C-alpha cells in the first residue's frame, strides 16, 4: 500500500507485516469461548449495584447471600436467586425471619422484577458455570507471544447492562486475584474496551461509582485499561479524570452541539503554547492524533501532534469460515463450551419444597384415615349395644308380620 509506505518513510520506522495469535470470547451464543460468572462471585455489593437497588433492597440481598452461605445453598445462576426469594417469602419465611429478621415483601418483589429485567438482556446465559478464569488472559503461545483475546459484541449492542456488568465483574475479579505490582515498566495485561459507551449508557450512578473505584485500584496490579470510543463525551468526567494516557483522533463539527463537545474535549488536554487545541482537533487527518501521557512523576506531558504508524496486522473483516477455524483449534473454546449444572440452591430448595408438600399430603391422608376409623368405631359401638340389637330384631319381626298379613299369610 503506497499510503502505508509513505507514512513509514515519513516517520522513519520500518513496516513489517505480521500476525498475532487471536482467540474469541463471547457473552452469548456467538462463536467463541463462553464467558460466565456465578452470582456468588459477584457478591452482594456488586450484584446490588448492577440491579440499581436502593439501600434497603441492598440489605435484603446481603442477608440473602448470608443465608445461602450459612445453609450451604450455592448461588450459581439467576434461577438459584429467584428460587431463594420464592422460598423466603413462602414456606421458609417463618424460619428465616426467626433467624435473620423480617424482610419486606415490597423489597423482594422489586428485586424479582429487576432479575426478570436482567434476564431479558440475556443474563441467563452469562450467569453459571464454569466461571471464566481471568488468568487465562495471560497465556502465551508456543513462541512466547501474548494472545489477543477479542470479545465479540455483535449481539450485545442493545444489552448495555449485561456488558457493563460483565466488565465490572471482570475488573473486580482481576483486582481480587492478581498480586500488587506497583509501578511497572510495562503492564502484564492490557484491556482495550471498544465501544466504551456501552458501559456507561444507561448505567446507574452507583454502577459508575463502582467502575471509577475499580479503575483507580486496578492500576496497582500492573493492568492497563484503554477506553475506545468515537467521542470523548461518551466517557463520564469522573472516569476520564482517572486516565493517564489520552490519544485523540480527529473530531468533526457539523452542528452547534458538536462544536460545544469539541470545546469540552479540548479542555481535557493540558494547555499548550503550540496548539489551538479545539481548532487542531477538527484538522487532524487519517493516522494523526493529539497525545499526552503521565511522566514518571505523574505529571501530564506536553501535548503533541503525532503521526501514527499503520497497524502491521491485517486490517480487514474475518470471514465466518476463518472465525470457525480459529475457534476449532482454540483450547479456551473447548474448556468453556460445556455448561456445568451441579446441584445448587434451586435444586436443593425445590427438593425441600417437594418434600414439604409430600409430608403435608401424607398428613392429610393420615387425618382422613383417622377420621374414618373414628366414624367406624362409633357405628360399631352403636350396633354392638344390646338394646339396639333388641330394637332391631323387634322392628324386623313387626315388618315381617305386616308384610305376610298383606299377602294373606298368617305368621306363627
Locate each region found by the language model.
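Generic beta-strand/beta-sheet core signal
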Residues: 25-27, 151-154, 192-194, 199, ...
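Conserved P-loop NTPase motor module
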Residues: 34-37, 51, 247, 280-384
Amino acid at each position: 500500500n503506497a499510503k502505508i509506505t509513505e507514512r513509514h518513510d515519513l516517520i522513519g520506522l520500518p513496516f513489517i507485516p505480521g500476525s498475532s495469535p487471536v482467540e474469541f470470547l463471547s457473552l452469548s451464543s456467538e462463536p467463541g469461548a463462553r464467558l460466565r460468572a456465578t452470582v456468588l462471585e459477584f457478591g452482594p455489593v456488586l450484584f446490588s449495584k448492577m440491579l440499581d437497588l436502593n439501600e434497603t433492597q441492598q440489605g435484603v440481598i446481603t442477608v440473602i447471600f448470608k443465608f445461602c452461605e450459612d445453609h450451604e445453598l450455592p448461588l450459581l445462576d439467576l434461577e438459584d436467586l429467584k428460587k431463594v426469594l420464592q422460598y423466603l417469602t413462602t414456606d421458609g419465611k417463618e424460619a428465616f425471619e426467626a433467624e435473620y429478621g423480617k424482610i419486606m415483601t415490597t423489597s423482594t418483589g422489586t428485586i424479582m422484577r429487576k432479575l426478570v429485567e436482567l434476564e431479558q438482556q440475556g443474563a441467563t446465559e452469562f450467569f453459571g458455570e464454569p466461571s471464566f478464569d481471568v488468568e487465562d488472559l495471560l497465556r502465551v503461545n508456543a513462541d512466547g507471544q501474548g494472545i489477543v483475546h477479542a470479545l465479540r459484541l455483535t449481539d450485545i449492542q442493545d444489552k448495555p447492562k449485561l456488558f457493563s456488568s460483565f466488565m465490572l465483574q471482570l475488573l473486580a475479579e482481576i483486582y481480587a486475584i492478581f498480586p500488587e505490582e506497583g509501578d511497572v515498566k510495562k503492564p502484564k495485561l492490557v484491556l482495550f474496551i471498544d465501544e466504551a459507551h456501552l458501559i456507561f449508557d444507561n448505567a446507574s450512578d452507583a454502577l459508575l461509582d463502582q467502575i471509577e473505584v475499580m479503575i483507580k485500584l486496578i492500576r496497582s496490579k500492573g493492568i492497563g485499561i484503554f477506553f475506545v470510543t468515537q467521542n470523548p463525551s461518551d466517557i463520564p468526567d469522573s472516569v476520564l479524570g482517572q486516565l493517564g494516557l489520552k490519544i485523540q483522533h480527529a473530531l468533526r463539527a457539523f452542528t452547534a452541539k458538536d462544536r460545544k463537545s469539541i470545546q469540552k474535549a479540548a479542555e481535557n488536554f493540558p494547555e499548550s503554547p503550540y496548539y489551538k487545541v479545539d481548532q487542531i482537533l477538527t484538522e487532524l487527518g487519517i493516522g494523526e492524533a493529539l497525545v499526552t501521557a503521565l511522566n514518571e512523576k505523574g505529571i501530564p506531558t506536553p501535548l503533541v501532534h503525532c503521526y501514527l504508524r499503520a497497524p502491521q496486522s491485517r486490517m480487514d473483516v474475518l470471514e465466518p469460515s476463518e472465525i470457525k477455524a480459529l475457534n476449532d483449534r482454540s483450547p479456551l473454546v473447548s474448556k468453556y463450551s460445556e455448561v456445568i449444572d451441579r446441584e445448587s440452591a434451586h435444586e436443593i430448595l425445590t427438593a425441600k419444597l417437594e418434600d414439604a408438600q409430600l409430608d403435608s399430603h401424607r398428613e392429610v391422608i393420615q387425618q382422613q384415615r383417622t377420621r374414618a376409623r373414628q366414624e367406624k368405631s362409633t357405628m360399631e359401638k352403636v350396633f354392638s349395644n344390646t338394646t339396639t340389637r333388641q330394637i332391631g330384631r323387634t322392628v324386623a319381626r313387626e315388618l315381617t308380620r305386616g308384610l305376610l298379613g298383606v299377602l294373606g299369610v298368617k305368621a306363627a
